[in-house]
């Protein structure tokens, strides 16, 4: 039997249809033979063979009819097989689509995680940038402050050049010694105390010199300002005490009577104010101003007491 009703690959679902086709093919032996010979071929090849049989005039009509029913059975079988293949392809495509959907979901989740990570990194980078900008601003402020200090330090005159210097170690009215007083100063004060009232006599002896110097100052400083000396400078205090300051540099001494200029009655004895001017800078001196002090260390000077120095 060419066809079996229980065969699912035949493509027929009803047994009576299969029986009718088998009956038609069985009218000639070429019908079942044509069916079995062409069962593994494609429909195009089966159709070509059937066309050749139908066009042949020598082939009997019974053979042509049996081969035609066999071709019909083969066509149904090929259609059923093609449907199965198509269903398998559809299933495969559906599975592939599901795989694509799952992959798309995974990629979407990965993309979401990546976006969150990038946002976190961006926020962290922004925070680090803000910290860096803050640190940079602080460093720039420190740099500007250091530049400002350096600029002031460059503009400020060097210490000890062209400035009035008050020598340390002078005795106060109460008899206390300032920090830096040497042994020679203490011995000089002790000797002055032993001498008693000789201090006023020394001031009286030293009196004309400051007056002459002041007279020279009033005359436009055409005469020398004072004595340029080297070695030990003798400074007189309020109580007739004397301290010695050792130096090796040439100085110019300005002698001035405070009570003669300010008229202060509280000044019992004259003060000697010394302005140290190093010799290389004597020619650079243009203006100077002295400030007299009372015996208690208070300033009593005024603008009218200033002396203007001409070019030396």
UniProtKB/Swiss-Prot annotation:
Family: Belongs to the TEX13 family.
Pfam families named among the record's database cross-references: TEX13, TEX13B-like_middle, TEX13B_C
Gene: TEX13B
Tissue localization of expression: Testis specific.
Domain of life: Eukaryota
Protein name: Testis-expressed protein 13B
MF annotations from Gene Ontology: mRNA binding
Signal sequence range: none
Organism: Homo sapiens
């Amino acid at each position: 039997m060419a066809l079996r009703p229980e065969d699912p690959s035949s493509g027929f679902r009803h047994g009576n249809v299969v029986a009718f086709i088998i009956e038609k093919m069985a009218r000639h032996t070429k019908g079942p033979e044509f069916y079995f010979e062409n069962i593994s071929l494609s429909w195009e090849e089966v159709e070509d063979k059937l066309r050749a049989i139908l066009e042949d005039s020598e082939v009997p009509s019974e053979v042509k009819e049996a081969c035609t029913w066999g071709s019909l059975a083969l066509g149904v079988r090929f259609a059923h097989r093609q449907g199965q293949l198509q269903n398998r392809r559809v299933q495969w495509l559906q599975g592939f689509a599901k795989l694509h959907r799952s992959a798309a979901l995974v990629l979407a989740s990965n993309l979401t995680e990546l976006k969150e990570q990038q946002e976190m990194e961006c926020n962290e980078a922004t925070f680090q940038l803000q910290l860096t900008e803050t640190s940079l601003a602080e460093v720039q402020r420190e740099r500007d402050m250091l530049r400002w200090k350096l600029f002031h330090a460059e503009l400020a005159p060097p210490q000890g050049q062209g400035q009035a210097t008050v020598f340390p170690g002078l005795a106060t009215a109460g008899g206390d010694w300032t920090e830096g007083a040497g042994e020679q100063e203490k011995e000089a004060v002790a000797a002055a105390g032993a001498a008693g009232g000789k201090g006023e006599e020394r001031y009286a002896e030293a009196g004309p010199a400051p007056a002459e110097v002041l007279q020279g100052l009033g005359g436009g400083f055409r005469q020398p300002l004072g004595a340029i000396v080297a070695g030990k400078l003798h400074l007189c205090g309020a109580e007739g005490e004397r301290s010695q300051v050792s130096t090796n540099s040439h100085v110019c001494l300005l002698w001035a009577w405070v009570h003669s200029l300010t008229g202060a009655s509280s000044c019992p004895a004259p003060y000697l104010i010394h302005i140290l001017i190093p010799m290389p800078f004597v020619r650079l001196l243009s203006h100077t101003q002295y400030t007299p002090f009372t015996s208690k260390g208070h300033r009593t000077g005024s603008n009218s007491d200033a002396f203007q120095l001409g070019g030396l």
